[in-house]
Amino acid sequence: MKTLLLTLVVVAIVCLDLGYTLTCLICPEKDCQKVHTCRNEEKICVKRFYDKNQLGWRAQRGCAVSCPKAKPNETVQCCSTDKCNK
């Protein structure tokens, strides 16, 4: 009986998704507080700065599977801890 119970506990632990889910900020404002839970495959928080037609720099934040390459007139910052893309 103890063996059966132990087996059931092990199976339950293996079947549960015990993985860590990253959270990143997702708003463009400088003092962004809007948090988004990333999908399981998204392990990177991204913050992109880009020049918006002489209106100054804008930021775009979110989750990503990998760190994207910067486009012309753009700066990309990537990190991998919760809400690190401030």
From Swiss-Prot:
One Gene Ontology CC term in the entry: extracellular region
Tissue expression summary: Expressed by the venom gland.
Entry keyword DNA repair: no
Transmembrane spans: none
Family in the record: Belongs to the three-finger toxin family. Ancestral subfamily. Orphan group II sub-subfamily.
Signal sequence annotation: 1-23
Localization terms from the record: Secreted
Record function comment: Binds with low affinity to muscular (alpha-1-beta-1-delta-epsilon/CHRNA1-CHRNB1-CHRND-CHRNE) and very low affinity to neuronal (alpha-7/CHRNA7) nicotinic acetylcholine receptor (nAChR).
Keyword Glycoprotein: no
Gene3D superfamilies xrefs: CD59
A molecular-function term among this protein's GO annotations: toxin activity
Pfam families: Toxin_cobra-type
Keywords for this protein: Acetylcholine receptor inhibiting toxin, Disulfide bond, Ion channel impairing toxin, Neurotoxin, Postsynaptic neurotoxin, Secreted, Signal, Toxin
Protein's UniProt name: Weak toxin 1
